[in-house]
Amino acid sequence: MARKISNKKTQRDLLAREKLFELAEKIYNQFENEVVPSISLPSRTKSNLEYSNESDVWVYGGRESERSAKTVKGAFQLLKTTYATEFLINEHLAQSRGSTLRELYYISEGWEAAKFKEQAESDRLIEDLELLTNLQREYFHMRPEEDGATMFGPIEITEQTNRGERNIHCQKDVGEGGYQIPFNVENIEFKAHDASMIIAIETGGMYARLMENGFDEAYNAILVHLKGQPARSTRRIIKRMNEELGIPVAVFTDGDPWSYRIYASVAYGAIKSAHLSEFMATPAAKFLGLQPSDIVEYELSTDKLTEQDINALRSELSDPRFESDYWKEQIQLQLDIGKKAEQQAFAGKGLNFVTEVYLPNRLKEMGML
């Protein structure tokens, strides 16, 4: 098992090296041929999202933006691209090392004119490299700064780490917090499972409630804590468990416009990273709740929608990820009632209500029980 994972890692490193060299060679050849260097990238805007019938996710369309040395700004962007490409090849891939996105920003202090002015600039450049190579930043050994999310449930895995191989049962071998998902889940192999569903949960409070109430055991459920807007590794492992193991996925969030976008990022991909949708999105994922109709049906405690909430809901009515009749009805209902609710509002009905009444009823309604 360890050799299998190690071989995959070697293959990924070779592919990343090849793609980065191709990019560097393209820019070099433009200089050689006395052509003003330039690169083209998909426009990362909502208006450039297109639905892929092949993969059932939203991806970037045909609109492009150009980075060209015809302008001073474009020339600096290309300079920084070449410095970053060289660094990733020589320092990361050649030496089997990695850096966080924050570290890359500080590393650039030694690049003189190619130094990044702020971290947002270096983050965007890594996204550019993903688009240009059609690879994920994990292939370049780039790590996020934040900790990974956690999961808890009846699944056994093998994880290859820098210190060797680990065999882990995500119920029996972990503490109350669950198994911490690593930033690169390609280093994980699934060994066995008894799961009948995956419940991806927005808040830590609801994740802990389902664990304490034994929902994972009662329904053979893998519980995944999304920690708000989910990290890429969290979305990727959900997709892998769904596609490779055939485990259905339900997403359980708060009942507000920002939480609906959390669901959309799991199911269809985020606008900012639509180039990775086919790699990370799980189009089979279903929205469990909290629905605006649940607020009405269960008479949950609520907060009034803010102007920001209202504007976000109206924006979602034109978001291609929410174009179904179901979403238009739910969003319009929420605008009509002017209310939002948190997952923990179910506690007002008793600590067991969410696991004994709401979830079983809703999962049956969704055809998952």
Swiss-Prot record:
Sections of the chain in a coiled coil: none
GO molecular function: ATP binding; DNA binding; DNA topoisomerase type II (double strand cut, ATP-hydrolyzing) activity; magnesium ion binding
UniProt entry keywords in alphabetical sequence: ATP-binding, DNA-binding, Isomerase, Magnesium, Metal-binding, Nucleotide-binding, Topoisomerase
Cofactor dependency: Mg(2+)
Reactions mediated catalytically: ATP-dependent breakage, passage and rejoining of double-stranded DNA
One GO location term (cellular component): chromosome
Residue sites binding Mg(2+) per the record: 202, 254
Biological process terms in GO annotation: DNA topological change
Entry keyword annotation includes Methyltransferase: no
Class of this enzyme: isomerase
EC number(s) recorded for this UniProt protein: 5.6.2.2
InterPro entries given in the database record: Spo11/TopoVI_A, Spo11/TopoVI_A_N, Spo11/TopoVI_A_sf, Topo_VI_alpha, TopoVI_A, TOPRIM_Topo6A/Spo11, WH-like_DNA-bd_sf
Active site (UniProt): 106 (o-(5'-phospho-dna)-tyrosine intermediate)
Presence of the UniProt keyword Nucleotide-binding in the record: yes
Residues covered by the Topo IIA-type catalytic domain: 11-149
Role played: Relaxes both positive and negative superturns and exhibits a strong decatenase activity.
The protein's assembly and partners: Homodimer. Heterotetramer of two Top6A and two Top6B chains.
Similarity section: Belongs to the TOP6A family.
Protein name (database record): Type 2 DNA topoisomerase 6 subunit A
Species: Methanosarcina barkeri (strain Fusaro / DSM 804)
